[in-house]
Amino acid sequence: MVKIGVLGLQGAVREHVKSVEASGAEAVVVKRIEQLEEIDGLILPGGESTTMRRLIDKYAFMEPLRTFAKSGKPMFGTCAGMILLAKTLIGYEEAHIGAMDITVERNAFGRQKDSFEAALSIEGVGEDFVGVFIRAPYVVEVADNVEVLSKHGNRMVAVRQDQFLAASFHPELTDDHRVTAYFVEMVKEAKMKKVV
């Protein structure tokens, strides 16, 4: 069974754990740097990206997260997690982890009161996935090596680049675990490649 970590500094941690377990993988809440070595993949949950960055800096997680990103192990960023993975953020000089060749705009769908749900078609996942958008970012631009998995209107809301997956919405806030299951499969495939 693959072990999937959920960065446990802030955000919808418990919901991600439930979704990982429902997808047939073992979930580990990552609160210490050394736990990164024990896991096969990592979820960066939604939350408030500036608060999350402050906590990442406080607990000296940034370099270990960048090292993890270079290790070939899959990472999945949802909402604020997408912001952490992006190489370019509109209105900001520097990226956070900066692992994905995407440009992201923060709070692009508006403030908290503008939160909404939308039925999405997601490549590799299926139709009618209910995306929960809460002060969500979206992808403005992608490099050629990034696959766009889903759009809401003309806005890119789910993307994949090699072992990295990012979504504007919160897949863990519904009982539909297909997006998490898709990531679990990515982790299994990456682990199999390492064995071979």
UniProtKB/Swiss-Prot annotation:
Molecular function terms, GO-annotated: glutaminase activity; pyridoxal 5'-phosphate synthase (glutamine hydrolysing) activity
Annotated pathway: Cofactor biosynthesis; pyridoxal 5'-phosphate biosynthesis
Gene3D superfamilies: 3.40.50.880
EC number in record: 4.3.3.6, 3.5.1.2
UniProt feature coiled coil, ranges: none
Single GO BP term: glutamine catabolic process
Annotated Gene Ontology cellular component terms: cytosol; glutaminase complex
Claim: Hydrolase is one of the keywords in the record: yes
Chain sites annotated for binding L-glutamine: G47, E48, S49, R106, I134, R135
Active site (record annotation): C79, H170, E172
Pfam families, per the entry: SNO
KW Transcription regulation (keyword) present: no
Keywords assigned by UniProt, alphabetized: Glutamine amidotransferase, Hydrolase, Lyase, Pyridoxal phosphate
Protein role: Catalyzes the hydrolysis of glutamine to glutamate and ammonia as part of the biosynthesis of pyridoxal 5'-phosphate. The resulting ammonia molecule is channeled to the active site of PdxS.
Family listed: Belongs to the glutaminase PdxT/SNO family.
Protein name, UniProt field: Pyridoxal 5'-phosphate synthase subunit PdxT
Lineage: Bacteria, Bacillati, Bacillota, Bacilli, Bacillales
Primary gene name: pdxT
